[in-house]
């Protein structure tokens, strides 16, 4: 094959899924000449699985990407066909927005954003090789011989690396939705010394809306109130489409059990580990054999298609078995299957080989983001993508990397878990993974991150000005509520009684004091006579949360200060752990392999005990005093 020089860029992004789109846009918006390469121009921002964005923890990630200046939130708002705020009966830490998206319109909108982004080129090509010279990345080589030179390369290849599609006893090379896999790039990474693993994921069948009897299902409408993921979206209303709820039956389970001998998960055809929190229907039936039924949601894939997504029935069973079990569900007795479900096995990069910036430790200038790092989900991919794009841009500008820690963002939790812990299954973000989740709420992502996005050049001056106005309104209103005292007259008594808030104050009380009562919301304060400013709902929500949960927030902030002290104790990257006496054998091996950046990160490595951390602290302090190189 004859090679030719096809172009020179600051940053080349390989892959245009949810990670690749964010990485490319971030690098270009930070002033880098950027190239995004995709296997198929018609599959930019493809949603090969669930046509949905958000949910617990995942919605938090979307809000954080948006606050930094990313695109997934805005694009979801454009393409949404239904939105719901989940967990409203619980505390604000776990409130989460979830949207159904028109998957085709989502792709078209995101593709247009990339095409219109100054400094970004979008091209179709199959990348076969990462070019490395003198230990540093120098660009990529495509299957047609095109050589694109670059100062940094971001790999966002999703599940395409040596992808293998499995349906029953049928198995063939392929990517999601019948696309081509990437084979030689996986071999190239292995040749470069990058350790790879192998995971599995899957998707359910798509069925024809015209063959469904919805009268036998429960309707799941969107919220009447209009929600948006992006803090700068101006969409005031949208026409929504409902989802539908049905259940598996004993007959469903019987068909599955009688065909386990044809299930690749149980015949040994699939050997790799799948996602724990999104198991196949055959796994659910086997694992929870005492459960008579499982929820199944029927979700529209878009406004201009009859395809419906069967959420909760991911499977790799043969096609005939899939159709038979689908027809045992209420409402699906005569259903027609438009696409079968399938499993896909793929190579991934063991993420402990990455720095917190998502740059590979072995090859400077090479970054990885998304499912190639062993994660699952569009949101996790987008979060890694924007961070990899930011850090690739900073790398070519010889600037310090941009790192978010666990106390600052769910993004920080996600990346720290990936680069610190040895994951053995596709990683999914959960609210339970965040120690400081009361501080990392979806409602305050802009207050946490927009200023950071502005400083690195991702957030526009116009957006930053809007953020500052909101921040000022929140501070002013909070001060007003703290300072405004009201007498406990008939009006206040009437409001408290109507809200079933017991125990009347014996004397005057501030509006903030009233708001701290569990039964009292901001809407109750508006019923008390006085001058109430006309404020946006998002400002009122923020003020109410800050006041009502003030004690808990302060307690968590104190915990964060302890965390930060450990994070600030840096460990030199060239430290010789062989010289650190007193470490256990396992701890020394793990520390040598992962090479944590701080004492805090070291303490989170499996196999590193508190005693090992103490030994390391003593060693570093002694080295500092003696003025050794490890200082």
Swiss-Prot record:
Its cofactor is FAD. InterPro entries: FAD/NAD-bd_sf, GIDA_C_N, MnmG, MnmG-rel, MnmG-rel_CS, MnmG_C, MnmG_C_subdom, MnmG_C_subdom_sf. Keywords: Cytoplasm, FAD, Flavoprotein, NAD, tRNA processing. It holds the Pfam family GIDA_C_1st. One of its GO terms (cellular component) is cytosol. It is found in: Cytoplasm. It comes from the Bacteria. The keyword Flavoprotein applies. NAD-binding protein involved in the addition of a carboxymethylaminomethyl (cmnm) group at the wobble position (U34) of certain tRNAs, forming tRNA-cmnm(5)s(2)U34. This is tRNA uridine 5-carboxymethylaminomethyl modification enzyme MnmG. It comes from Pelotomaculum thermopropionicum (strain DSM 13744 / JCM 10971 / SI).
């Amino acid at each position: 094959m004859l090679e030719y020089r096809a172009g020179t860029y600051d940053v080349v992004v390989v892959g245009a899924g949810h990670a690749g789109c964010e990485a490319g846009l971030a690098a270009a918006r930070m002033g880098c000449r950027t190239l995004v390469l995709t296997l198929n121009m018609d599959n930019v921002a493809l949603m090969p699985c669930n046509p949905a964005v958000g949910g617990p923890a995942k919605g938090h990630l979307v809000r954080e990407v948006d606050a930094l200046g990313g695109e997934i939130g805005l694009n979801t708002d454009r393409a949404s066909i239904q939105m719901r705020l989940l967990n409203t009966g619980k505390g604000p830490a776990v409130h989460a927005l979830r949207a159904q998206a028109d998957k085709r319109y989502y792709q078209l909108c995101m593709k247009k954003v990339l095409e219109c982004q100054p400094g970004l080129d979008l091209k179709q090509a199959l990348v076969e090789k990462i070019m490395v010279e003198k230990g540093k990345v120098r660009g990529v080589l495509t299957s047609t011989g095109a050589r694109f030179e670059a100062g940094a390369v971001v790999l966002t290849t999703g599940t395409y690396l040596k992808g293998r599609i499995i349906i029953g006893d049928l198995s063939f090379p392929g990517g999601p939705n019948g696309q081509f896999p990437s084979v030689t790039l996986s071999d190239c990474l292995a040749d470069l010394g990058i350790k790879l693993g192998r995971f599995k994921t899957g998707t359910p069948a798509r069925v024809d809306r015209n063959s469904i009897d919805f009268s036998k299902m429960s309707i799941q409408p969107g919220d009447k109130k209009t929600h948006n993921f992006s803090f700068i979206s101006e969409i005031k209303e949208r026409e929504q489409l409902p989802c539908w709820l049905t259940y598996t039956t004993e007959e469903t389970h019987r068909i599955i059990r009688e065909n386990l001998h044809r299930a690749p998960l149980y015949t040994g055809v699939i050997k790799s580990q799948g996602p724990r929190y999104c198991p196949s229907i055959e796994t659910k039936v086997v694992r929870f054999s005492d459960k008579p039924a499982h929820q199944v949601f029927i979700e529209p894939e878009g406004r201009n298609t009859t395809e419906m997504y069967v959420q909760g029935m991911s499977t790799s069973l043969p096609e005939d078995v899939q159709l038979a079990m689908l027809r045992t569900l209420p409402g699906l007795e005569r259903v027609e299957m438009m696409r079968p479900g399938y499993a896909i096995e793929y190579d991934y990069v063991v993420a402990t080989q990455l720095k917190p910036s998502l740059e590979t430790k072995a090859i400077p200038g090479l970054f990885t983001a998304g499912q190639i790092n062993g994660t699952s989900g569009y949101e996790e991919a987008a979060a890694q993508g924007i961070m990899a794009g930011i850090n690739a841009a900073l790398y070519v500008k010889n600037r310090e990397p941009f790192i978010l820690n666990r106390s600052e963002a769910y993004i920080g939790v996600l990346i720290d878990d990936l680069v610190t812990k040895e994951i053995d299954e596709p990683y999914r973000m959960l609210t339970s993974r965040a120690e400081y989740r009361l501080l990392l709420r979806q409602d305050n992502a802009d207050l946490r991150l927009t200023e950071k996005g502005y400083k690195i050049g991702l957030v526009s001056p116009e957006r930053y000005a809007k953020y500052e106005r909101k921040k000022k309104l929140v501070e002013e209103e909070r001060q007003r509520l703290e300072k405004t005292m009201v007498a406990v007259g008939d009006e206040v008594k009437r409001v408290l009684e109507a809200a079933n808030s017991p125990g009347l104050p014996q004397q005057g009380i501030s509006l903030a004091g009233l708001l701290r009562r569990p039964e009292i919301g901001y809407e109750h304060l508006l019923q008390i006579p006085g001058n109430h400013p006309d404020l946006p709902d998002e400002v009122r929500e923020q003020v109410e949360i800050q006041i009502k949960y003030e004690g808990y927030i302060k307690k968590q902030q104190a915990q964060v200060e302890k965390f930060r002290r450990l994070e600030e104790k840096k460990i030199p990257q060239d430290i010789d752990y062989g010289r650190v006496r007193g470490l256990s054998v396992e701890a020394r091996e793990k520390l040598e392999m992962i090479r944590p950046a701080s004492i805090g990160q070291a303490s989170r490595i499996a196999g590193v005990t508190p005693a090992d951390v103490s030994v390391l602290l003593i060693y570093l302090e002694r080295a500092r005093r003696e003025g050794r190189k490890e200082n």
